[in-house]
């Protein structure tokens, strides 16, 4: 989908697809694969488009919590004259991530360690404890979920994270939305044949 924003100095590239619900057995691995690919500042796509190429101030993906199928969403605001090149880079990064350049042990370990270290801060207030209880009820997680979460995070295997990426991210099923100055970007984007 293309949405015109005449005179825009940047384009916002949005890409996403439906994935498994928050109650899925591999929900932690899905979160880890998301963070390696595009969910954190040091993720592959952000490092590529922001740090290596300087085409974007920052990209980010997310897996919002949901009882049913939930979206994997990536947002990449990029400079207008690099819109098509950025789309190609995102396509390449995703294809390689589920193909011949999956998450490395170092990338996975970095996310696991960060998630474990963040645990104490997740339960500092009454509101955060209440939120954790609400999540357990909403998603059908066991009563000992909070107590066992550290062990669950640490138990994620590299192969399980890579399998979550392959089962969750299917490039041919992704929906693309680009918002920008169509006078400048429409023709080259249409040549990509995104959908």
Residue ranges of predicted features:
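A short, acidic, flexible beta-alpha connecting loop/helix-capping segment that sits on the rim
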Residues: 180-184
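His/Glu-based metal-binding/catalytic segments typifying zinc-dependent metallopeptidases
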Residues: 1-42
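Short proline/glycine-enriched turn/loop segments at secondary-structure junctions
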Residues: 164-167, 190
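M16 family metallopeptidases and their MPP-like homologs
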Residues: 10-21, 30, 46-99, 105-158, ...
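Short, aromatic/basic amphipathic alpha-helical patches
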Residues: 185-194
């Amino acid at each position: 989908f293309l949405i015109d924003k005449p005179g825009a100095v940047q384009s916002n590239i949005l890409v996403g697809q439906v994935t498994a619900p928050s109650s899925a057995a591999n929900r932690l691995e899905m979160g880890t694969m998301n963070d390696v690919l595009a969910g954190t500042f040091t993720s592959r796509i952000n490092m590529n488009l922001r740090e290596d190429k300087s085409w974007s101030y920052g990209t980010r993906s997310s897996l919002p919590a949901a009882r049913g199928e939930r979206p994997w969403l990536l947002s990449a605001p990029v400079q207008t004259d690099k819109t098509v090149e950025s789309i190609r880079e995102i396509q390449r990064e995703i294809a390689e991530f589920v193909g011949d350049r999956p998450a490395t042990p170092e990338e996975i370990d970095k996310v696991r360690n960060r998630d474990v270290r963040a645990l104490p801060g997740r339960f500092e207030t009454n509101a955060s404890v209440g939120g954790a209880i609400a999540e357990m009820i909403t998603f059908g997680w066991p009563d000992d979920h909070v107590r066992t979460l550290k062990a669950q995070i640490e138990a994620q295997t590299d192969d399980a994270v890579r399998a979550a990426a392959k089962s969750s991210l299917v490039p041919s099923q992704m929906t693309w939305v680009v918002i920008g100055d169509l006078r400048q970007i429409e023709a080259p984007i249409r040549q990509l044949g995104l959908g």
